[in-house]
């Protein structure tokens, strides 16, 4: 299941974070990082998924 979430996080980082933590602070931070740059959003999403 984590592999699927990581693949989703690579394609749509905020969706991967949302599936892991819901509408928390990490989700909104990921939205911001993705808007500022796609790569930081991916790195943050993979970190959140791997951490839990």
Swiss-Prot record:
Mark the transmembrane ranges: 6-26, 29-49
Keywords tagged on the record: Cell membrane, Membrane, Transmembrane, Transmembrane helix
Q: Which Pfam families match?
A: Pmp3
What membrane topology term does the record carry? Multi-pass membrane protein
Q: What is its main location?
A: membrane
The record's listing under InterPro entries reads: PMP3
Q: Name the GO cellular-component terms.
A: plasma membrane
Cell compartments where the protein resides? Cell membrane
Top-level division of the source organism's lineage: Bacteria
Q: Which family does it belong to?
A: Belongs to the UPF0057 (PMP3) family.
This one is known as UPF0057 membrane protein PA0567
Q: Which species is this record about?
A: Pseudomonas aeruginosa (strain ATCC 15692 / DSM 22644 / CIP 104116 / JCM 14847 / LMG 12228 / 1C / PRS 101 / PAO1)
């Amino acid at each position: 299941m984590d592999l699927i979430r990581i693949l989703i996080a690579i394609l749509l980082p905020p969706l991967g974070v949302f599936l892991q933590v819901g509408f928390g602070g990490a989700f909104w931070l990921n939205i911001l990082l993705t808007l500022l740059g796609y790569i930081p959003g991916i790195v943050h999403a993979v970190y959140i998924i791997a951490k839990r």
